[in-house]
Amino acid sequence: MISSNDFRPGVSIVLDGSVWRVIDFLHVKPGKGSAFVRTTLKNVQSGKVLEKTFRAGETVPQATLEKITMQHTYKEGDEFVFMDMESYEEGRLSASQIGDRVKYLKEGMEVNVIRWGEQVLEVELANSVVLEVIQTDPGVKGDTATGGTKPAIVETGATVMVPLFISQGERIKIDTRDDKYLGRE
C-alpha cells in the first residue's frame, strides 16, 4: 500500500483492477476543509488518461512491477519470440503487446519487458537504435527548399525523415521515442 502523500511521477498503483502510472500530481491544502491530492493517471495497458482526486493520506495498493531484460531472437508468424537473459526461457509477444516501437525491433536486440504478475504491460526499447538505410531517394544538389530532409526506409521497415546527404546502405542512429534522425553511425 502507498499513501497518496507519497505519489510521484512514475509511481504505479492498482485502481479498479488495472495498473495506472502517476503522470502528474498536485497536493492541495484549501483554507477550509481537508487537504487532497489531485493526480493525472495513465492506464499502462490501454494508454487511457484519467484525472482523479485522492484524500491526503489515503492509501491505495501499489503495483509491484517486474522489469526483465529479454533478447528478441526471431519472429514466428505474428508473434515475436524473446529469450530471458537470466533464465534463458522463451516468451512470445504479439505486435499489439509491444506497441508502436515494434517498427524498430530487430533480431538480437535487448529490450526491457515490464510485467505485473504474469501479464506483460509494456516493452521498453533503448532510447536510440542504429539501423541501416535500405531505400531512399538520392539527394539532389541545391534541393533544400523543403527543409533539407527526405524519407528513408530502414532495415526494419520503418520510415524516418533524414537529411539529404544520407544515402542507401548507410547506418543511422534513430531516437525511438519520437522517430527522429540523430546522426550517422
From Swiss-Prot:
CDD domains listed in its UniProt record: S1_EF-P_repeat_1 (cd04470), S1_EF-P_repeat_2 (cd05794)
SUPFAM superfamilies reported for this sequence: Nucleic acid-binding proteins, Translation proteins SH3-like domain
One GO process term, biological-process aspect: peptide biosynthetic process
PROSITE patterns: EFP (PS01275)
UniProt main location, coarse: cytoplasm
Tree of life domain: Bacteria
Pathway: Protein biosynthesis; polypeptide chain elongation
Keyword list, A-Z: Cytoplasm, Elongation factor, Protein biosynthesis
One Pfam assignment: EFP_N
GO CC annotations, alphabetized: cytoplasm
Entry's Gene Ontology molecular function annotations: translation elongation factor activity
Subcellular location: Cytoplasm
InterPro entries, per database record: Elong-fact-P_C, NA-bd_OB-fold, Rib_uL2_dom2, Transl_elong_fac_P/YeiP, Transl_elong_KOW-like, Transl_elong_P/YeiP_cen, Transl_elong_P/YeiP_CS, Transl_elongation_fac_P
Cited function: Involved in peptide bond synthesis. Stimulates efficient translation and peptide-bond synthesis on native or reconstituted 70S ribosomes in vitro. Probably functions indirectly by altering the affinity of the ribosome for aminoacyl-tRNA, thus increasing their reactivity as acceptors for peptidyl transferase.
Family the UniProt entry places it in: Belongs to the elongation factor P family.
Protein name: Elongation factor P
